[in-house]
């Protein structure tokens, strides 16, 4: 008996987002079609005003399209009310932003626990999973520290641990390296490479070619449209430092930075 076909993580069908009206009408997105399969690694590039941030907000269920259809892991988002959308967003998407969005007077491990608390996970299980996520990003020894006691790179790792703690189907990152130095940027990209090598779907919004170079697929946007969509080097053609094992080793070696 044939196995059922798995639905894509992201399916956008003629998604448009309009602001204003009449002479002031702005098409932030204009009939965008996009499919992202499980295990893909996609970078979205474009100048300011190209529509990439609006696209991220709709994929992340932070905004609703003016028209079109959006399925997230097979779930038709337009059929959900606000409460249901929030639950799906918390369970299926891990967000990583340029600003780390950590609660200042809350420890690293408690910050990571937050999505699990919203999902109703019991405290003991929350703590176990949060510590495991911090270990996955190489910063378990800082679990009891406040954000003010961590470097920028360490704070970003805490934010990444929080993003993966619910085991989401999609990691969605918006300019994740914007507040990092070059060393922390390299470590963050090594984490993304490792996550994707382990089968996790990653979508990154960026204007930096060096960040996009880590993806398997690069989209370019202009005036609310996807104007190019191309595959890059196959995984077997990539440098060996991009493998999952090598990425984990790199993070482990630099975990005290």
PLM regions: where:
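ABC-family P-loop ATPase nucleotide-binding domain
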Residues: 1-18, 231-257
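ABC family nucleotide-binding domain
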Residues: 7-215, 220-221, 226
């Amino acid at each position: 008996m044939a196995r059922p076909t798995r639905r894509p993580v992201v399916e956008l069908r003629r998604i448009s987002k309009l602001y204003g009206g009449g002479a002031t009408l702005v098409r932030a997105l204009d009939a965008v079609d996009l499919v992202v399969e499980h295990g893909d690694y996609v970078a979205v590039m474009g100048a300011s005003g190209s529509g990439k941030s609006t696209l991220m907000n709709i994929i992340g269920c932070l905004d609703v399209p003016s028209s079109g259809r959006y399925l997230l892991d097979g779930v038709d988002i337009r059929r959900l009310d606000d409460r249901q959308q929030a639950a799906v967003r918390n369970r299926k998407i891990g967000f990583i932003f340029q600003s780390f969005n950590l609660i200042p007077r809350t420890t690293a491990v408690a910050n990571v626990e937050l999505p699990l608390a919203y999902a109703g996970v019991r405290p003991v299980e929350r703590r176990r999973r949060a510590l495991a996520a911090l270990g996955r990003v190489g910063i378990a020894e800082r679990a009891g520290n406040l954000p003010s006691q961590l470097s920028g790179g360490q704070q970003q790792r805490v934010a990444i641990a929080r993003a993966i703690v619910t085991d989401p189907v999609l990691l969605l990152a918006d300019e994740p390296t914007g507040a990092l130095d070059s060393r922390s940027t390299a470590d963050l990209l090594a984490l993304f490479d490792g996550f994707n090598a382990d089968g996790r779907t990653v979508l990154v919004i960026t204007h930096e070619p060096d960040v996009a170079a880590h993806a398997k697929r690069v989209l370019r946007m202009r005036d609310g449209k996807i104007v190019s969509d191309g595959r890059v080097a196959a995984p077997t053609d990539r440098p060996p430092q991009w493998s999952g094992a090598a990425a984990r080793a790199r993070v482990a070696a630099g975990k005290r930075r």
